[in-house]
C-alpha cells in the first residue's frame, strides 16, 4: 500500500493565527472565553479547553473574549466590547473581507449568498448586510442581484448555483463575485487532481467542518473516499487499496495528519513522501 500525502495540508493562516493567539493569551494567565468553537475541529478544541479556554456567555467567567475565526455580527461585537475588559477579534481576514464586500455591494442589488444559512460565518455576515443565504437555486422576482459565496464553499458548486439561478430567473443585472478563500480553492484543485491516481482518499478533519466536507465530496468523485477525525476511524480493510492519498481541511493540525500516516504505516503502508508534512 502506497501512502501519498497532499502538499497542502494542516492549518490555513487564519486558523493558525486564531489558535496561536488564544494559546498566547492563556499562557499569559488570562481568563479567556468565547461563545463557540474557535475552529471546527474537535481535537483542537479539546486541547484549548484543557489549557483553560472557556465557552461561556457569562462575562464573569473571563477577562478576555475572543471572536471566533468565523466572525460574529457587528452589533454583537460592539456589545461585547462594552461588557469585557478586552475583546480580541480573531475573524479570519478573508472572512472579514467577505463581510465588507457584502456591505459594499448591498446597495447594488439583492445579496444572494451561496452557503449554509446556519453556519457561523453566514450568521455573522447577515449582521453586516441583509442577504438570502441558500445552497438551492430558486425563482425570485428580484431584478438586480449580487452573488457572493461562503468562503469555504466549492468553487465548482458555486458556479453551478449561479448558472442555475440565471437560467431560472429574468435578472436585469447580476453581479458575480468570487469570495471563496484562495487557500481552500487550491486544496480543492489538488484534491481533484491527486484523487484521480488514488484507490482510496482519506480526508482528515472535523465532521462539521464545511471545507473538509467539500474536499470529501470532491475526492469521492474520483476514488473511494473516507472522512476521518482521528486515526482510530481508519477501517482495517484499508490494506486492500494499492494507493492511499491523504488530504486535510484547513482546521486540521499537521500532528493529526502525521498520526493518520503513522497508523497507515502500521497497517503495512509505505510512505512515499510529499511536501506537506515532516517525517
Curated annotation (Swiss-Prot):
Task performed by this protein:
Catalyzes the conversion of 1-hydroxy-2-methyl-2-(E)-butenyl 4-diphosphate (HMBPP) into a mixture of isopentenyl diphosphate (IPP) and dimethylallyl diphosphate (DMAPP). Acts in the terminal step of the DOXP/MEP pathway for isoprenoid precursor biosynthesis.
Listed GO MF terms: 4 iron, 4 sulfur cluster binding; 4-hydroxy-3-methylbut-2-enyl diphosphate reductase activity; metal ion binding
**Residues holding (2E)-4-hydroxy-3-methylbut-2-enyl diphosphate:** 40, 70, 119, 151, 209-211, 251
Organism of origin is Thermotoga neapolitana (strain ATCC 49049 / DSM 4359 / NBRC 107923 / NS-E)
Gene3D superfamilies registered for this protein in UniProt: 3.40.50.11270, 4-hydroxy-3-methylbut-2-enyl diphosphate reductase, catalytic domain
In the UniProt entry, which residues are flagged as the active site?
A: 121 (proton donor)
Q: Which reaction does it catalyse?
A: isopentenyl diphosphate + 2 oxidized [2Fe-2S]-[ferredoxin] + H2O = (2E)-4-hydroxy-3-methylbut-2-enyl diphosphate + 2 reduced [2Fe-2S]-[ferredoxin] + 2 H(+); dimethylallyl diphosphate + 2 oxidized [2Fe-2S]-[ferredoxin] + H2O = (2E)-4-hydroxy-3-methylbut-2-enyl diphosphate + 2 reduced [2Fe-2S]-[ferredoxin] + 2 H(+)
Report which superkingdom the organism of origin falls in.
Bacteria
Cofactor field: [4Fe-4S] cluster
What lineage is on file?
Answer: Bacteria, Thermotogati, Thermotogota, Thermotogae, Thermotogales
The reply on keyword Transmembrane is no
**Cofactor binding annotation:** Binds 1 [4Fe-4S] cluster per subunit.
**UniProt-annotated binding residues for isopentenyl diphosphate:** 40, 70, 119, 209-211, 251
Binding locations of [4Fe-4S] cluster: 12, 92, 181
Q: Tell me the residue numbers annotated for binding dimethylallyl diphosphate.
A: 40, 70, 119, 209-211, 251
Q: Please state what the protein is called.
A: 4-hydroxy-3-methylbut-2-enyl diphosphate reductase
UniProt keywords (A-Z) are: 4Fe-4S, Iron, Iron-sulfur, Isoprene biosynthesis, Metal-binding, Oxidoreductase
Q: Name the family the entry cites.
A: Belongs to the IspH family.
Q: Which biological process terms from the Gene Ontology are attached to this UniProt entry?
A: dimethylallyl diphosphate biosynthetic process; isopentenyl diphosphate biosynthetic process, methylerythritol 4-phosphate pathway; terpenoid biosynthetic process
Describe which pathway this protein belongs to, using the record's wording.
Answer: Isoprenoid biosynthesis; dimethylallyl diphosphate biosynthesis; dimethylallyl diphosphate from (2E)-4-hydroxy-3-methylbutenyl diphosphate: step 1/1; Isoprenoid biosynthesis; isopentenyl diphosphate biosynthesis via DXP pathway; isopentenyl diphosphate from 1-deoxy-D-xylulose 5-phosphate: step 6/6
Amino acid at each position: 500500500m502506497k501512502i501519498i500525502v497532499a502538499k497542502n495540508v494542516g492549518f490555513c493562516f487564519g486558523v493558525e493565527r486564531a489558535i496561536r493567539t488564544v494559546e498566547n493569551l492563556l499562557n499569559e494567565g488570562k481568563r479567556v472565553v468565547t461563545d463557540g468553537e474557535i475552529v471546527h475541529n474537535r481535537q483542537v478544541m479539546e486541547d484549548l479547553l484543557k489549557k483553560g479556554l472557556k465557552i461561556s456567555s457569562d462575562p464573569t467567567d473571563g477577562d478576555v473574549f475572543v471572536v471566533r475565526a468565523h466572525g460574529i455580527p457587528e452589533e454583537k461585537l460592539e456589545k461585547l466590547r462594552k461588557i469585557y475588559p478586552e475583546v480580541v477579534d480573531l475573524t479570519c481576514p478573508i472572512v472579514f473581507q467577505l463581510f465588507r464586500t457584502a456591505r459594499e455591494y448591498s446597495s447594488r442589488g439583492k445579496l444572494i449568498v451561496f452557503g449554509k444559512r446556519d453556519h457561523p460565518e453566514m450568521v455573522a455576515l447577515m449582521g453586516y448586510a441583509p442577504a438570502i443565504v441558500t445552497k438551492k437555486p430558486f425563482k425570485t422576482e428580484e431584478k438586480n442581484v449580487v452573488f457572493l459565496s461562503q468562503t469555504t464553499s466549492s468553487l465548482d458548486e458555486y458556479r453551478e448555483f449561479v448558472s442555475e439561478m440565471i437560467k431560472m430567473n429574468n435578472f436585469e443585472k447580476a453581479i458575480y463575485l468570487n469570495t471563496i478563500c484562495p487557500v481552500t480553492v487550491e486544496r480543492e484543485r489538488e484534491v481533484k487532481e491527486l484523487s484521480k491516481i488514488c484507490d482510496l482518499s482519506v480526508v482528515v478533519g472535523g465532521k462539521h467542518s464545511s471545507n473538509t466536507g467539500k474536499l470529501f465530496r470532491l475526492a469521492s468523485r474520483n476514488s473511494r473516499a473516507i472522512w476521518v477525525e482521528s486515526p482510530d476511524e481508519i477501517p482495517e480493510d484499508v490494506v486492500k487499496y494499492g494507493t492511499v492519498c491523504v488530504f486535510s481541511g484547513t482546521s486540521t493540525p499537521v500532528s493529526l495528519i502525521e498520526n493518520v500516516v503513522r497508523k497507515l504505516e502500521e497497517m503495512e503502508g509505505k510512505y512515499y513522501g510529499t511536501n506537506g508534512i515532516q517525517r
